[in-house]
Amino acid sequence: MGNNEHTIVYLIGMGPGNSDCLTREAVQALSQATVCIGASRMLAIWKSLCEEDGRDAEQTFYNAYKAEEIAELIQNHGGETIAVVFSGDIGFYSGAKKLSMMLRKAVGKVCNMVDDTTGTTEQIQADKTIYELCYIPGLSSVQYLFDKIGWAWEDAELISNHGVSANIPAKVLHHAKVGTLLGGENQVAEVCKRLTEVGLGEIAVVVGEWLSYPDEKITKKYAKNLCEETFDKLAVAIFINDHPQPRRLAPGIKDEMFIRGKVPMTKEEVRMVVIAKLGIQEDTGLVKYDQNSGQFVISNPAPVIYDVGAGTGSVSIELALLTERGTVYAIEKKPEAVKLMYANRRRFHAGNMEIIEGEASEVIPSLPAPTHVFIGGNGGNLFKIMDQIYAKNPNARIVLTAVTLETQAEMLTLADIAKRHNVDFNMVQMAVTRSREAGTYHMMQAQNPVWIVTMG
């Protein structure tokens, strides 16, 4: 490359797919480009438009969709005008975000933002080249579907389940309208099965396929009626809940609201303290470059929570409802308790609660590494379970409870384990006294004292 090379990179949103949905600005940028990079479906949009106009697409085309590969191609074409094409809009779950971050890392640092008549561009200075990034919006397929069915999307919850995992049941539970990108031929059915499992089968679902194309298809049914249907792998869906529930901001579900049977349950006041001690935080969604791994990672990832000895699932359900982005693994070996957990999960619509049946020490090795763990029962395998947890994540925060004297004595040895793993250790005793009616009077009745240990 010679001195003072100037490379223009257009990051273009191509809309839902039909060339009629391209903006005039996008067409102008594509016409100026000498190199065009993107997934084959996006490249085909521009090629078909050129054919309709009776001219050849004269650019050099590269079929690529991975940010690393695209960044390398851009560097190999220094001094040229490059168009990188993305489906939908570049600001809505688009690869444009990762690519711009990758370019900053690969070729240099941001020099300045330049305002001109065409909008705001970003300049990145490399050793001998200035890369000018020009961002051109497109029409999102989710926006297109909302408009097609005549629904405003300004007050909708917008998410993506394409290439990432989103807690769709929680979003649907708490919002009247949820628009989402999907990926995979069976994903609509899988999401609807999950909604039905957690008691949300009566939610209305609108599915859009091949949006903007001549064979566009829009289907509207209840979630429970879509569990076996197959849709295009790039389908878009809108979930409509006529009776959304307000989201809980603190624990404290009344004990009597749970289906209990004869299975022991962590009581309301203890649950509140345990959840506070766990100190769970939602992920920020902020993506940063990690020098050690050489990858872009979420700075504060979504919590992965174990509830060991989950019983009726009362703690798991409270946690699931509070941590919309996290996943709670409720681990229980007793069949009667597992049956109750399924019933309670359905009652409270806890879509991010995974029920794991089996002995904790046997199932933990196959689970994702936890960020937080509550141990309410351990089946006599406490130390083995602790070793497994710390092997998966030495920084996991663990809260344990004990009622019997035998378990309390066992917990005293945990101080040594905490010291060995260089984590904080704290133990408190909690005694709750509740009022109860005694004829025309009220009396205070003491509950069993509970020991609560926090490690980490």
Predicted regions and their residues:
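A contiguous loop/helix-start segment that scaffolds small-molecule binding in enzyme catalytic cores
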Residues: 7-11, 81-82, 175-263
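Class I S-adenosyl-L-methionine
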Residues: 1-133, 143, 332, 351-367
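Conserved SAM-binding loop
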Residues: 341-342
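C-terminal substrate-binding/active-site "lid" region of AdoMet-derived donor-dependent transferases
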Residues: 386-449
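Class I SAM-dependent methyltransferase SAM-binding "motif I" and its flanking Rossmann-like core
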Residues: 7, 18, 88, 92-175, ...
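Conserved S-adenosyl-L-methionine
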Residues: 321-327, 392-394
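Conserved class I S-adenosyl-L-methionine
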Residues: 284-291, 302-311
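Conserved SAM-binding loop of SAM-dependent methyltransferases across substrates and taxa
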Residues: 296-297, 312-324
